[in-house]
Amino acid sequence: MNIKKLLIISFILVGCVAVSMAENPKNFYNPVTSGVPSLTISPDARAGGMGDVGAATEPDINSQYWNPAKYANIKSVAGVSLSYTPWLRKIVKDIDLAYLAGYYKIGDLQAVSMSLRYFSLGSIALTDNEGTPMGTGKPNEFSLDVAYSRQLSKYFSMAVAMRYIYSGLGIKDENYSPGHAFGADIAMYSGIPISLNTGVSMLGIGLNLSNISTKISYDKRNTEIFLPANMRLGVSYAIPFDAYNKLSINFDINKILVPAYPQSKNYEGGVTSEEYDAAKGKYEKMSSIAAIFYSFADAYDNPAYTRKEAFMDELREVNWSTGLEYSYNNQFFGRFGYSNESKWKGNRKFFTFGAGFKLTAFQLDVGYVLGLAPTTPLDQTLRFSLSFDVDGLKDLVDLGK
C-alpha cells in the first residue's frame, strides 16, 4: 500500500524539519511525536495572530481550545464562531482545518460550551505493492467536545471538557481501520481586575491540561499510539490607556505530555540491543496517564545523555509564545506575536500578524504566519474567523424596533 504522501504530511505536522547532526552529536534531533497531531493546530485567527497564545487571554468565543474555564467569565450570554485555515499551502493545496465553537451562559457563574474540529488531508492516490492503482483515499480527522465551566470564587473558575476523536487514514486495506479515542481537559483561569488611573486593567492567569485520553489504534489494537496530551500555562495583562485604547500583553508556555520514542542509535548495538528492545517495550506498554508523568523525565533514561544533558533535553520540550493585542474602542484590533520551539524538537519558529473588526453582533478576524526557519511549511499560513455574539444580535433587534 503506497501511503507516501500521507506519511510525509504526518511527518510535517509534528514539525519534523531536517537538521544537521554534525553540529553537536549529543544534541540530536529528537522531536516528540504522537497520533492525531491535528489536535495541536491552533484553530482560530485571534490567537493565531498573537503567536498562538490563549491560556490566559481575555475570554472569547474560541476559548474552548485554549482554556474553557474562561467561558465562566465571559460577559455575553452566548456566542458562536466559525474558523477556517488552509493548512500547509506551501507543500500541498488540499489540506484544510475547519473549526466551529460556541457557548451558552447559565446564569452569571457557569457556562456550557462545545467545539467541532474537522481536518481534511485531501485526496491520496492509493496503489498496491506493485504500483497498481487502487483508487483514491481521503484521510480525515475530527473531534467533538463539550465543556462545563463555573466560577468557584470571585476571581477563579474551572472547567472540565470531554472529547471524542476520530482519525481515518483513508487506506483501503482490511488490516487497517479508522481510529477512535476519548479524551478530557481540565482547565483553570483567574481574572484579577487592577484599578489604574486610566481605568481597570486585567491580570489573567490560566492553565489547561488537554487531551488526557485513551490511545488510538489503526490496526485493531495491535499497535496503540499516544494522543498529544498537552499542558499550557499562560499569563496575560490588559492595560487601558484611556476610554478607547487598550493593549494586552500575553505569554504562554506549552509542553506536550508524551514521552519521546526511544532511538536505536542511542543504544550500543543499535536495533539489536536488548536495552533498546526493553525501552521500546516500556514505551509501547505504558498507559496514557503514566506517560503524562513520565514525559517530564523520559530523557533521563536515554543512555546517550548525562544527567545535566537530560535535564536540558527536558527543558527543550517546553515551547513558548508571546503576543500583543491592541484594541481601539473594542472595535478595531491589531495583533502581533512570536512562537518558539527548540531546533532539536521541531524548529517551529515564526512571527504572526493579525487584525480584527467588530460591529455590534459580528466580528471578523484574520491571522497570518511568517515562518523563520528556512524550510518551515507553516510560512504564509492564513486563518479566518467569523464570530456572532447573541447580546449584540439582541441589540440590533432592539434598534430595529
Where do the PLM segments sit?
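Subset of outer-membrane beta-barrel
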Residues: 23-401
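Bacterial Sec-dependent N-terminal signal peptides
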Residues: 1-25, 235
